[in-house]
UniProtKB/Swiss-Prot annotation:
Taxonomic placement: Eukaryota, Viridiplantae, Streptophyta, Embryophyta, Tracheophyta
This protein's record includes keyword Glycosyltransferase: yes
Signal peptide: none
Protein name in the entry: Anthocyanidin 3-O-glucosyltransferase
Gene, per the UniProt record: BZ1
TM region positions: none
Amino acid sequence: MAPPPPHIAVVAFPFSSHAAVLFSFARALAAAAPAGTSLSFLTTADNAAQLRKAGALPGNLRFVEVPDGVPPGETSCLSPPRRMDLFMAAAEAGGVRVGLEAACASAGGARVSCVVGDAFVWTADAASAAGAPWVAVWTAASCALLAHLRTDALRRDVGDQAASRADELLVAHAGLGGYRVRDLPDGVVSGDFNYVISLLVHRQAQRLPKAATAVALNTFPGLDPPDLIAALAAELPNCLPLGPYHLLPGAEPTADTNEAPADPHGCLAWLDRRPARSVAYVSFGTNATARPDELQELAAGLEASGAPFLWSLRGVVAAAPRGFLERAPGLVVPWAPQVGVLRHAAVGAFVTHAGWASVMEGVSSGVPMACRPFFGDQTMNARSVASVWGFGTAFDGPMTRGAVANAVATLLRGEDGERMRAKAQELQAMVGKAFEPDGGCRKNFDEFVEIVCRV
């Protein structure tokens, strides 16, 4: 009797860019899986509603809701951090197991044959309880993953001297020699080690090498230093570079399927009227938010640069200098189709929070960056951009108008900017090669599909 077709459950962490990145990954997996394979994408109801806006689902991919932990009647008044805490508590209490049971029911009783998802412990626990292998998808940078895997060793080394040794390079830790103590993610050697996120990430790093059947990395061959990749490969099973995930075949909606992403504010048409490489694109993602006084400095710096800019900013520029929107040669919108914007010929610079999804979108578009990290692994990503790879610059602390004007002018018109652009385009070419039919990422993805579709 033939075995049943694979039923893959993809479990999302429904905050920041995690779910969107994993959703792109799930779309690619749905496109590549053998005929008869079904996929259930587990996330909260609110997150599913947002992801549905990206376009129609492939026929073999469905949403399955998991508990968000939000008490009835409190939905409208909760802050994002509070929502995250409630979700994690629900997940720890068995929310993902409930989701896997719902996935089985929605698939006509077909048992889940593999669990794919963010590298969080509750996903591993739920997979174990369901008797299914767990395959982890790391959505952040490889350097951040190595830092989390080495947390105990780093804490023993740095001790309570994180502040006094902030500028010291981590040369004693293989794969991390290009990074300083200050670049490490929050909760590794500084910050509140008992904060729920710090504890969670520490636990997942301890569990990952033992529990995961394979680990997908959001990077491509040649991007990370060889000693970093070697260090990861020594600790993780089937460590497969597959990124940027949004470039996997089938990951993005396409115009020929009438699923092209919307551009409700006319960003691309506005860019069409600008000269090549003349525009600075500014976006700090969905969760990073600068203080009002820093936003004012950013606005003043953009105006002082004299360059046209496209600024994706939720809400209004209440803190901007008086008359800014009337005087400055820019467009401010609450949302922009970022991948399409970065690919546009008019965009010559990217001012970013250095979230990993944004960094990878910038790399794959060949656009040099000016990084203003805020939290998490963003400082490490900014260090990678500015020092390890050299295709951008990083602000030293909060943005000032002078620093913004100088960064934009450098990236768009300066000699250093030309060097950074050349490096960005070199990396872009490497990305393209990795995703050719016989490229490293395509071959690794074929191996990944084979692993998750075993039944």
